[in-house]
């Protein structure tokens, strides 16, 4: 009985460490979004918007190209965090499995070959898991979707900020705030007016059931979900 309790405590310890690491990965993604918001603010500081004008990336080819670069880098780094976390936690799960097997091998009649088979890391299965699709989208496509949503939100935020004469520093602060509090942005866009902008904001404001209005929060949830599934 004492050995069983000791095993339970040991296995729970593996789980606790896993959840701590998973939150660390999610925080890495949050920092990537903050960096991207700062890059969008820096980009906006070089734009000369006519008085009363509306900002749209399509009207500023150079800014649009820079925005595409920001989104591409963001998506690549998020995917790297997720896949690295998946591999790390997959192997952590193997260690947990090893601990469990070690506790029963003392009294089992498994051969050495059978025990080794149970303890295999099966990285081929991990690779297949990482390449799977959900709703027709692979991991890269799902990550890209959220990164693209950030660009749309930043476009609205830049439009509002430039219209209010915000400095690059002020805009950077606002854009960072919008990452976790998108409602602030949608209210300001609504107050500013403009049917086109309201239409785009409304679409982002009602993303669908089970989906955050915040691209950053959606990406963090994706990170947690993918890594937890690998574990």
Model-predicted segments: where are they?
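Acidic, glycine-rich two-metal-ion catalytic cores of nucleic acid-processing enzymes
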Residues: 203-231
């Amino acid at each position: 009985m004492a050995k069983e309790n000791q095993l339970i405590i040991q296995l729970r310890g593996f789980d606790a460490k896993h959840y701590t690491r998973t939150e660390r990965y999610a925080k890495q993604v949050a920092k990537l979004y903050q960096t991207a918001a700062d890059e969008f603010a820096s980009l906006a500081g070089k734009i000369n918007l006519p008085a009363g004008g509306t900002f749209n990336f399509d009207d500023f080819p150079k800014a649009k190209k820079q925005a595409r670069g920001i989104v591409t880098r963001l998506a690549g780094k998020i995917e790297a965090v997720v896949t690295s976390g998946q591999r790390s936690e997959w192997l952590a799960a193997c260690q947990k499995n090893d601990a469990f097997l070690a506790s029963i091998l003392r009294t089992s009649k498994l051969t050495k070959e059978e025990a080794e088979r149970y303890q295999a890391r099966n990285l081929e299965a991990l690779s297949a898991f990482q390449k799977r699709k959900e709703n027709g989208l692979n991991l890269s496509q799902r990550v890209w979707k959220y990164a693209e949503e950030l660009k749309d939100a930043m476009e609205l935020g830049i439009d509002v900020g430039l219209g209010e004469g915000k400095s690059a520093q002020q805009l950077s602060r606002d854009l960072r705030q919008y990452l976790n509090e998108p409602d602030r942005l949608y209210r300001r866009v609504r107050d500013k007016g403009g049917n086109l902008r309201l239409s785009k904001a409304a679409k982002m404001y009602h993303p669908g059931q089970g989906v955050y209005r915040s691209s950053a929060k959606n990406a963090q949830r994706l990170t947690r979900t993918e890594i937890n599934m690998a574990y």
